[in-house]
């Protein structure tokens, strides 16, 4: 399973998260990447911790490199966590 597949699977298994295809975050100058909306009332730090645990449990390769540079933005009352190293 690739890192992108793992993110998609994890989000699909957890209703408090939602995929954001083609997100362009701060400093990306129009480049697009994969993002995840963490709904209001949920911690984006918990999302990251649990996502990395999910990847470890599923033996996902190259997770460190692909997750490097992950950032977040406010999205109304939600938060979007985005991964510039993962195309969208």
Regions from the language model: what does each represent?
Residues 1-2, 42:
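Short coil/turn linker and secondary-structure boundary residues
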Residues 2-16, 51-55:
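Short amphipathic alpha-helix segments
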Residues 20-88:
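Acidic, low-complexity, intrinsically disordered interaction modules
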